[in-house]
Amino acid sequence: MRKYMVYRTILFLIFSLPVTQVIAQENIPELNKRIIEYVESVIDKKVDRGECWDLAYQALNRFNAQWDGKFQYGKLINPKREPVLPGDIIQFKNVKIRYQITYTTYTEFMKQHTAIVYKVKGKNVFTIAHQNTEFSGRKVGLSDLNLAHVVKGDVKIYRPIPKSNK
């Protein structure tokens, strides 16, 4: 019975993610893996001043990533054309998110916010790590994000890239 349940769980996980996402999860760049390891080490802890940007700043600088030191965190990717991976960085600008749980509608606003993709749960559905939020304060916390719930604003996703050794 136990083997059957394990087999059933594996099948569910395989078929609940799009094929490209399953393949992508196996091909995570080394830099992204290191960023996720760092994020895991700081969950429920305050990073620097506790600003959302500080988490990405520390992760990118710690592993010598190439970025502009402001809001361009690597290579801009298009989630419609290429898979989003754990360790990718999301920049929100003037974003409004609206979603419903049972009979309650929730609305969230993000004037300027930075987060790191912690897990990919499905196409454009992620668990993100971020701080300076209502739910976790200035400590790093995890929450879910579904890009289909974004009704306004600009969401950019960046793939961290290593600095070239020139």
Language-model features and meaning:
Residues 48-51, 99, 137-138:
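Short, solvent-exposed loop/turn elements at domain surfaces
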